[in-house]
Every structure is written in C-alpha cells, then in structure tokens.
Amino acid sequence: MHHKALLISLASTALALHGSSSHSHLGKRFTFPLPSSKGSVTFDAPKIISGNTTFDGGMKTYGRGVECTEGEGGDSDAVFWVENGGTLKNAIIGADQIEGVHCMGACTIENVWWEAVCEDALSLKEGSGPFTVIGGGAQGAEDKVIQHNSGGTVSIDGFTVYNFGKLYRSCGNCDEMFERHVTVSGVTAVQGSTLVGINSNYGDTATIKGDVCATDVDTICQEYEGNSSGEEPPETGSGPSSACKYSEPLPAC
C-alpha cells in the first residue's frame, strides 16, 4: 500500500512539473495596470478637443453611457474627437462606449487608458500625422486597438496592451489607401494575436524596437496585400523583412 501511494505521489509530482515546464508563461499572472479612477464623466456627444489645445482628464473615467459592443460605430459614437494638433492626456476610457478616441489630424495621446476596447480604442482618421501615443494602455480588444485609416507616421511608446487582437493595424481596405509608417518602442504586449499589421504593397513599414516585450503574442509583424475595393486583404508574410523592421526574438515580458 505504501509502495502504491509512493508511485501515485511521484506520478503527480512529475505531471505537475511537466505542466509547469510546458506552460511556464502562465505561471506569472499578468495584471493589467489600470490606474485608479478619480471620478466618472458621461458625455452625450463626443468631447471635442480643439486643434493645438490640451485636454487633461485628471485621471477620471470618460464614457458615453452605452453598451460596449464590437459593432461598427461612427464619429458620433466616439468619446473624444481630437482635432489637428490636439492632445488628450491623463484619462481613462470606460467600458460604456463604442468608438473610444478619434484623431481628426495630428494628435498626441498621452497616459490614456482603455478599461475595455469595444470597436477600436484609437482611430486615426485624417491627415498625415504625426500621431503620437505615449504611455497608457488598453485591454480586451477582440480586434484592433489602434486603427490607422489616414496616411503618415505613428509612434507608439511605452504603451501596455493585454488580451488583444492587434495593437496596430494599417487599414487594409479603406476607400482611399495611403502609405503608412509605425514605430513601436517600450511596449508591453501580453496575450495577443498580432502586434502590428501593415500593407507592404502600399509601402507601409513597421519599426519595432528592441525594448518591446511580448508574451503569448502569436505574430509580431504581419504583412498584408491591401486594397481599396473593400475586399478582405490577404496575408502575404510575417516576421522580419524590409517592411517589418525588427529582430527576433523579442524578449518576454
């Protein structure tokens, strides 16, 4: 009886060790560092941040008082519109919204956190940038966190993204297509499908710095063949290339 119990104990220990080895990345539970909210504000319409002005949200939570869904919304469903040259900083976007933040020209998004991503967190709608994201983070995006519809350059620095589809996607089938460039630095990415997606046939590039960490992210840089006909763009390759500029492997977070 003692011998049988010993065998069972050894088998259980071996199984536990195997599970620990094969799923070691699950051993450290990631906690999304959402800041504490200092109050809540519900808008009846998008809050407009005029060009070349700064709105400091004071780390309050901002929403629209609607159910968070993946349905395609419009500009009128955004929480904030940031006009050309405007800055949104120190804000939490609540789960009671659909479209998050829309940049209607060059913008700076600094220390902005999304409690939940519904359609997209941040949509870059007009102009050629620069579009600058500094700090902040987002979680729970079934698809895209940052959607880039216009042209130009995007910088994403120090952002935290957790449980996501894509951190950044250059629109693959907009009516009007542009060349787009994104630089990703200091980003913490955990449990996602794709870090960045670009259309290399339009001259897009993604530069991913060595201080980016990724844990349980399936694809770091995915290339597509974009189009302006509305068709679903096919994947054309992934990994380091002349369009996807980075070195593998990225460090784990």
From Swiss-Prot:
- Record's protein name: Probable pectate lyase D
**GO BP field:** cell wall organization; pectin catabolic process
Keywords of this entry: Calcium, Carbohydrate metabolism, Cell wall biogenesis/degradation, Glycoprotein, Lyase, Polysaccharide degradation, Secreted, Signal
| Cysteines paired by S-S bonds | none
Cofactor binding note: Binds 1 Ca(2+) ion per subunit.
Q: Which gene encodes it?
A: plyD
Query: Where does the signal sequence lie?
Result: 1-16
Per the UniProt entry, the Enzyme Commission number(s) are 4.2.2.2
Q: Which GO terms describe its cellular component?
A: extracellular region
Query: Per the record, what are the reactions this protein catalyses?
Result: Eliminative cleavage of (1->4)-alpha-D-galacturonan to give oligosaccharides with 4-deoxy-alpha-D-galact-4-enuronosyl groups at their non-reducing ends
User: Where is this protein chiefly located?
Assistant: secreted
Q: What does this protein do?
A: Pectinolytic enzyme consist of four classes of enzymes: pectin lyase, polygalacturonase, pectin methylesterase and rhamnogalacturonase. Among pectinolytic enzymes, pectin lyase is the most important in depolymerization of pectin, since it cleaves internal glycosidic bonds of highly methylated pectins. Favors pectate, the anion, over pectin, the methyl ester.
Q: Name one Pfam family in it.
A: Pectate_lyase
Q: Which cofactor does it need?
A: Ca(2+)
Name the species this protein comes from: Aspergillus terreus (strain NIH 2624 / FGSC A1156)
Q: Where is this region: Disordered?
A: 224-253
Where is this protein localized, as stated in its record? Secreted
Gene Ontology molecular function terms on file: pectate lyase activity
Sugar-bearing residue positions: N52, N227
Enzyme class comes to lyase
> Which protein family is it in?
Belongs to the polysaccharide lyase 3 family.
